[in-house]
């Protein structure tokens, strides 16, 4: 915690090192060994630091148990099965609980499931519209607004990412919650890998997809299809991002 305080400050002295906008916490393993899953450690970070906390919300203990259920499987469907929506919801609920307990600013990264989006309907708002604390915001990726299990079945590990591409029902609820304002922003979680690395197949292939260069064209396609307006895209990818 001391290193984090030096980087982002404390409640009493909220001065961050220039260029550091906050703390990202992996509540479940995704990239390398980056992980803070212990509730006591998480509460210390929420209590003793300043600035924004952004969380990759997957419950590590549940994920570890469910990983045992797919031992020996090489089909890509196993990825979303063991990193399921309850795994994500548990971590999202914990982060919201800690934000309410401490009053800390919270941003929940790359929302993927319908049950999370519905749960956050009562918790998220733009900072400029907030009436008190905590201020909680969230985001969604074009990948999760576009793909579902049929695409994963067709394209395999090229669509493998964490948290995973889920199901058509999740995609539709994410759209609903983006339009109604529960979700404030469009992000990308840009994490490209070579085709050589992806060719290893599941579960050895790395998780991650490109996103920066495709995000705006994908969203403009939705404008052309009538799913949203250009003003919506401007809010989700520009003004709301600045607000957050």
How would you describe each model-predicted region?
Residues 2-186:
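Histidine/acidic residue-rich metal-binding segments in metalloenzymes
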Residues 74-103, 158, 179-180, 185-186, ...:
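His/Asp/Glu-enriched, well-ordered alpha-helical/loop segment
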């Amino acid at each position: 915690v001391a290193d984090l305080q030096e980087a982002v400050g404390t409640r009493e002295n909220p001065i961050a090192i220039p260029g550091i906008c906050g703390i990202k916490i992996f509540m479940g393993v995704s990239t390398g060994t980056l992980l803070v899953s212990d509730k006591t450690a998480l509460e210390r970070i929420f209590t003793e630091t300043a600035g924004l906390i952004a969380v990759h919300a997957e419950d590590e203990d549940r994920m570890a148990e469910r990983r045992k259920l797919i031992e020996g499987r090489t089909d890509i469907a196993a990825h979303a099965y063991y990193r399921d929506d309850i795994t994500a919801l548990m971590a999202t609920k914990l982060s919201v609980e800690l934000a309410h307990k401490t009053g800390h600013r919270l941003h929940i990264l790359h929302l993927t499931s319908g049950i999370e989006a519905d749960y956050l309907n009562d918790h998220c708002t733009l900072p400029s519209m907030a009436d008190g604390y905590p201020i909680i915001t969230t985001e969604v990726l074009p990948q999760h607004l576009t793909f579902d299990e049929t695409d994963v079945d067709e394209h395999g590990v090229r669509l493998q990412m964490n948290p995973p591409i889920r199901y058509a029902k999740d995609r539709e609820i994410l759209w609903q919650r983006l339009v109604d304002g529960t979700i404030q922003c469009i992000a990308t979680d840009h994490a490209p890998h070579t085709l050589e690395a992806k060719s290893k197949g599941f579960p050895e292939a790395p998780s991650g997809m490109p996103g920066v260069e495709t995000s705006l064209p994908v969203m403009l396609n939705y404008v052309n299809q009538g799913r949203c307006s250009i003003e919506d895209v401007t809010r989700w990818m520009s003004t709301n991002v600045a607000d957050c």
